[in-house]
Each structure stands twice: as C-alpha cells, then as structure tokens.
Amino acid sequence: MDLASAPRGESPPLKAPLVEIEAAEVERSLPQENAAPEEKGSNSQSEYESDSDALDDEWETQSLYEDAIQMIRDDQLRDGTIPGACTLEEAIEFRKRLHEVGKAQFVEETIARDTVTAKKLCTAFGILPPSFLEGAPDEAYHPLLAIAISREFARRQKLPQYNSVDDAVKLLKESKNIIVLTGAGISTSLGIPDFRSKDTGLYSKLENLGLNDPQEVFDIRIFREDPGIFYSIAKDILPTEKKFSPTHGFIRLLQDKGKLLTNYTQNIDNIEANAGVFPENIVQCHGSFATATCVKCQYKVAGDEIYDDIKKGLIPECAQCRKRIAEDSQKPQGQKRKRNSTSAHKDRSKSGEDSSDGEDYEIPTPGVMKPDITFFGEDLPDEFGRRLLHHDRDKVDLVIVIGTSLKVAPVAEVPGVLPPHIPQIYISRTPVAHTNFDIDLLGDCDVVVSELCRRAGWELKHEMISPDEKVDVTPVFGYGSRHVFKVSG
C-alpha cells in the first residue's frame, strides 16, 4: 500500500474538511475546574500537576470511547474476520507511517488525498466502525478517527530488541531498579475475584444484583448515600487469611534481591504485606483495607478491627462515636445537643405540635467506618504521583506489569509516563490493545513468574508451586514477542 506523499509535480487538491487531529486533545488542554494557578519558581509542583492532569484527562476521554465503541484486535485483522477492515500488514504500515511523519502529514497523505477512507483507517488503529454510522458519509467517521490517531500517536512504541522469553529472563537478571505494577489478577488464585473478567469478575456479579453500573458500588457518592451497597459485597473482596500468591512471593523475591524499586499496586487487599514486601516499597494506588476511618469524626483504626462486621455483611460503626454517644446520654437534659435547624421547630409550632416532647433533640448515631480504599470520585494518594514523577521515573530500568487490564486512570498511564527506552514486560491472561509492551507473557500470573524464576536460576518457594511443575511456552502466531505459558504436568 502506498503511504508516500503525492507524486512529484502538481499535487491533487486536498479534501475539505480535514480531520481535526487535535480534537482529541482539546479537553486535555482546558484548565481544571479546581486546579491551582501555576506559581513561578515552583517547577516541581507545576510539573507534577500538569503531568497528572494531562494523563487523567487523556485516559478518561479514551476510556469513554473504549466503553462505547467495539475494539478490534490485531488477530482479527490478521485473520480477516472484519469485513472492510485493513489487513494486519496494512494496519502495521499505517501505524508506522504515523509515527514517522506525525499526525498532520499522516492525515494529508491519507484522508486529505483520498488514499483510504476514514472508515477503513479507523480499523488500522483498532476501532470497529460503529453500526449507527453505517451508510453515513465518510466525513462522519472523522471525529472517531481523530481520537484513534491521537491515541496511537501518544502510545509508547515497542523496543524491537526485546522479544523472546530469554530476553525477559535476561532483563530480569540484569535490571536493578524494577517497577512492578500489579492488579487484581495476582490475587485471583487466592479466591479473591478480579473486577473485569467475564462471568467471574466482581463487576459481573454486581450486574446480577441489579445495579445500573457495577462501578456504583465503589462510587463515593453512593457510599455516602447507602454504605450498605458496598458492604453487601465487601466480604467477597476481603482478605480473610494471611496468605499470599506465588506472584506476591515473586515481588518479595525481587525485594530480597535488591531489585525492587517500587510496587505500584491497584489492589486493596493489602496482601503484599502478607508476603513481606516492605511498606516503603509499596504505593497502594487505590488504598487498602489495612486501615479504616470514620466518615463522621475521622477516627482511624486498623482494618482488621472491622473485619468481623464485614464478614457478617454488617455496616461497621465507629467505636469512638458510640463511646461519645454513650457519654452524652449520661449528661443532664440541658447539656444535650439540639438540632441545628430552627425551621422544623417553627413549622411544628405553626401546626400546633408540641415542641417540648423531646423531638427537638437529634437522635445521635455513630459514624460509618469506611476502609481507606480510594473510591471513584476520590483523589488518589499524593504519594502516587510524587513518587512516580519525582523519584522512580529517573531511576527505573525495567517495568513489569502483572495481572491488570490497565483500564483505570491514572494508573493506566504509568507505562506511557516512563522514559520510552525503558523495557516493559506484560504478564496476564490476555494482552491489552491500548498499550505497547515489549514482551507479552500470557497465562496464569503465578505460572508465568514461577517459570521465569526457574529459567533465571532463582528459587521461588511457595506451597502453590509444585516442585515437579512443567510449563509449556509457545509463541503466538504472528507475534514475535507474545508467548503463552501453560502447565503441562
């Protein structure tokens, strides 16, 4: 396929209107509603704010499209199962050309010169043209294509020198400052459900409970209105025993070998502590069950103090509030707290109600204890951005992403924030389409890390790993850097 500029001589007229390639970046460039103005002389702070805001906005915009639009995998392009789509070879060439010449020149060479339709070009960047646009003029696909082009152009590019399992093992042995980014997939072998796996994930279970949006259970507004929704499923994600998976043990092994820079975990189960990973080596991006705080008085306790209530499906209440309520009940009547509002009193007086019957006094209730996990609508801990941008980014020499689909901002943008020359390995059951990793190791996380350790000559001791375990590793057809791990015996 010819992706070169028009032949020498008179160029054909450009089509109008052109794809607005910057459209996907407009929202990112707008100032945040509550953003503090940039102060001169505070370079580190302004850098953190601008980086974090841009990443957050970009991923939210992209996630909306990914939720609404069906994505195309490269294997579907390879197998030709999508009518009217690019072949995999064409798609790869389009992507390569985009990164070679930039967005503006790429649009001129393709859409502006009619070398390919916008509808077909969307498929090169992994987007299935939506059915509601079927029959529409090609210009109707331009906004969608603008998002696809901007997203692809911003993607980290794979390092061509890293492809094989041996390459992964060599990186593991030679690296000294490894960032490990983990998700729910590293805890599923312990019986803790993940969030997104079809039929088995936690979100699927919540859909069966009749929630409009499974994410509502982790929405801070919903929690404030009805904490019972969260506590109805909290027992399913609560770590009940001091166990840890082989993958947690692998992270501990990296620490013991002096190779672990930081474990950024999206998990809230705090199992890393069970494995012996030091607190100073962990950033709990979404908080954890390790502690809990009263939503009324901010009294903080160790998380295990509310475990019994959670296991029973009860809403844990603040012991400090209960103590204060009990003390208040012993005070003379005149010292009790009255209602703040006077309007209710006036309304009752007008209607002839007796306001001296004790209804003027509020009925005290203890506050609800909320585990210190980060709900949707709450800010991530400051430590996340501060450590990533001002400490780890300049030190890291290898990134290993394990057991996460990288769907939630801003953690999902960590691979793209780090220097592009740093090698990155992805370990999970299925590959991700929106991030380019250098090596994809597909399969059960525990199986993959145990085999990596075996090949590296490291001893990963764990009761869940059979000493006689044999693992078959097979390459994925059409992908030189993608490998599947399966236990064979």
From Swiss-Prot:
Subcellular compartments: Nucleus
The EC number(s) this enzyme carries: 2.3.1.286
Domain Deacetylase sirtuin-type intervals: 158-459
GO function term, MF aspect, one: histone H4K16 deacetylase activity, NAD-dependent
Cofactor binding: number and manner: Binds 1 zinc ion per subunit.
Binding site for NAD(+): 183-203, 266-269, 403-405, 428-430, 445
Reaction catalysed by this enzyme: N(6)-acetyl-L-lysyl-[protein] + NAD(+) + H2O = 2''-O-acetyl-ADP-D-ribose + nicotinamide + L-lysyl-[protein]
Active site (record annotation): H286
Keyword check for Cell inner membrane: no
Chief localization: nucleus
Binding sites annotated in the UniProt record for Zn(2+): C294, C297, C318, C321
Alphabetized UniProt keyword annotations: Metal-binding, NAD, Nucleus, Repressor, Transcription, Transcription regulation, Transferase, Zinc
Region: Disordered, residue numbers: 1-56, 327-370
N-terminal signal peptide: none
GO cellular component: chromosome, subtelomeric region; mating-type region heterochromatin; nucleus; pericentric heterochromatin; rDNA heterochromatin
Cofactor(s) required, per the database record: Zn(2+)
Ranges annotated as biased composition (Basic and acidic residues): 344-353
GO biological-process terms attached to the record: heterochromatin formation; siRNA-independent facultative heterochromatin formation
Function: NAD-dependent histone deacetylase, which could function in telomeric silencing, cell cycle progression and chromosome stability.
Protein name: NAD-dependent protein deacetylase hst1
